[in-house]
Amino acid sequence: MLDGIRYIINRDSNEVWENLIKQTTLASAVETDGVGLHTAVPVHVRLTPAPPDTGYVFRRTDLGGFEIPATVESVAHCGYATTLMRTGVMLSTVEHLLSALRGLGVDNVYIDVDNLEIPILDGSAEVFAEMIEKAGIVSQPLARRALLVREKVAFEQGNRRISVEPGDHYQIDCLIDFPHPMIGVQQFSIDLNNGAFSREIAAARTFGFTDEIEALRRANLIRGGSLDNAIVLTPDGMLNKTGLRFRDEFVRHKILDIIGDLALLGMPILGKVVAERSGHIMHAGLMSKLLRVRSAWDIVDVPETHVQSPRSNVQSLVSAT
C-alpha cells in the first residue's frame, strides 16, 4: 500500500460507511488456459477472491505459490510488455489482466499462474473481462481507497509524454501517431464509469508490424504471437482477415495498456490522465515520478458522490496509512 494521508468523508456521521464506495472482490473463482505472447509457453491462470486491502497479488503455483504483488515497486522491465519481479522471480505481460480488473472495478484478487507469463488469449482484455463477469463481483466491508490527484505531474521523453492532473473521476485521454495508412493520428477519451471499459476498451487488441517481427523473434519476443492474438500490420494494410473491432482499435488498445499499467498504483485514480505517443516505459516513468512528488496526491476513501467533486467532500484528516 502507498504511504500517504487517508481522508474519510463525514467521519462523525453514523452513516459514513453507507456513503462510501466499498472495496470489491470476486464472488467465486474462475480460470482459463492459454499461451504466453513472448514465451509461447502454455499457462493456466486462476482468479480467486481475496480479503479487503489485499490488492492484486500474483502467485506462481509452479514455484510453491511464490507471491509477487502488483505494485510499482515490483516493475522490473517494461519494453514490449510489463514484467514484475520479486527476489529474482518474474512474471511477464500482466497489463491486460490488470486492465480488466481495474476497468471493471475489482480491488482485491489472488491471481494464480503456473508459468512466467500471463496468457495473451485474443490479444485484448475481453476474455479476462468475461471471466470476471462470470465470477461475479461482490462488495467488502471496507471503503475503497483512491489516489486523489492534487497537482499535475508529467513525464516526457522527446515527443512522448504522459501526465496526470486533478479531475473529479478517472478519465483518460490518449493520442497516438503512427505513419501507417490504417492508423495515422488517433485520439480517444474515456471516463471509466458505468461500464465504459467493457463497452469501449476491453475488446481492443494489441498490434504489431510485419517489418518488426523478425527482429523481435531474434530477441526471443512474440514467439507466441499469431493472427489469433494480435493485429498484424503490413506496410499498406493488415494480415488479419477478420477486420478491426473498432475503427480506432489501435488507440483504444493503448488506453487498455494505460489502465493496466497504472493499476500498479494499487487503487483507482481520481484524476485525468493525458497521454501522447505513450507506452509501457512512459507509464512506469509517470508512476515513479508521481509517487516521488508527495504534494501531488492524497489517498482518500471514495464517496458515492465522487463523480461530482471529491475534493469538496473531503472533511477530516484521520491518519496516515
Feature-to-residue mapping (PLM):
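C-terminal regulatory domains involved in ligand/effector binding and gene-expression control
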Residues: 2-107, 112-321
